[in-house]
Amino acid sequence: MAVLSSLELPNGSYNDDGHQIRTGTLWTAIAHILTAVIGSGVLSLAWSVAQLGWIAGPISMFCFAMVTCVSSFLLSHCYRYPDPVTGARHHFYMDAVKTYLARKQTWICGFLQILSMYGFGIAYVITTSISMRAIQKSNCYHKEGHQAPCTYGDSFYMLLFGAIQIVCSQIPDFRNMEWLSILASIMSFSYASIGFALGFAKVIGNRRVKGSISGVQTATIAQKVWKVSQALGDIAFAYPYSVILIEIQDTLKSPPPENQTMKKASMTAVLITTFFYLCCGCFGYAAFGDQTPGNLLTGFGFYEPYWLIDFANACIVLHLVGGYQVFSQPVFAVFEKWCAEKVPNSGFVNNSYTIKIPQLPVLRINLLRLCFRTCYVLSTTGLAMLFPYFNQVLGLLGALNFWPLTIYFPVQMYFVQRKIEPWTRNWIILQSFSFFCLLVSLIALVGSVEGLISERLS
């Protein structure tokens, strides 16, 4: 076993900023985005459309898609400073905020970004366990009949997913994850397509389109308001990748300029995503109407063909193995970079231990990476076991993440990047855009908190 200090760079090619030569392309960027976006959020969209109805549901998805595109375009120009093509690179979202905005805003951004990505980890643990349990229930219903009491717990599957993530978390960084993102993207296309196809087939079988313009009927107006608010939060959760856009852009090679490649990748990925979202959400609602389950593939609106339900849920599990890493790796990188700066001479922080095992690739283990990442995974798994509420957790995370990280900080950084003066036309348009999104976030936040508290106390 050999010891290699991370301060001593192994032989290879490096950019002028000390990082390895970037090899990312338009297609790898699209793969990273799709891995981040088409996740557990797609499974709740049929329920969201059911709460909003046939007009407000699809319109809401289009609006969130357009907002995501605008935000990603603004943020892609802030990757370099001062010039968006030739300026110094930023490796993390928080680095960009630190350059463009005040120190206080940097701390707020860093806290919200880490909280958001940590929350996505919790949501992915919940979703994976539900999908694993759904496979077991699907087989039970097939053997015992649809009325059989096929009841199983989530805890074992959460612990199993946590164990898998402890191993996957030892992947050093984003640049070593391209294969995992490509695999995860294939899986996301697979289960989104299956959800769409099953919904479409059920609509054909029903010979009618269920649902209404006003959505699911509730006993009181207050209940309707809470459900609509939570549905908006769930849709906001389904478009979350602005929080890791800078990290994805930092993998791209240049030329062509990274901001141009990222804009093309964002537009392509959002178009693909929105198509699948509309298909899954609308056909799911058309198939089940007011009885639309909270999770389209695990709520057991579909029982047969059971093997296809099993395959779709297996695809969800494989996708979320990669999705968890897409949102966790930036947190790992920030913490480990901070430790390396604070204690540059610590062997625990900076030394890597090379282990050679016959017939296997060389393993490089860093003790800080091993300890911190393991504790991180254990904590997300523990909180998921404490709050295993799918729709409520997704809505809360979407509401918390949407305005500050997707709208406010990109808009404020763009003002500095483009030197936009207050009360000019562009300033008024973007500030109005930001204020409207703030109102939507507050509405979604209130509804999601109410739903989470109600579920916990019920």
Say what each PLM segment does.
Residues 45-53, 174-175, 391-392:
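Short, hydrophobic transmembrane alpha-helix segments
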Residues 48-81, 86-87:
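Extracellular loop-to-transmembrane helix junctions
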Residues 32, 60-65, 265, 269:
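Alpha-helical transmembrane segments of multi-pass membrane proteins, especially transporters
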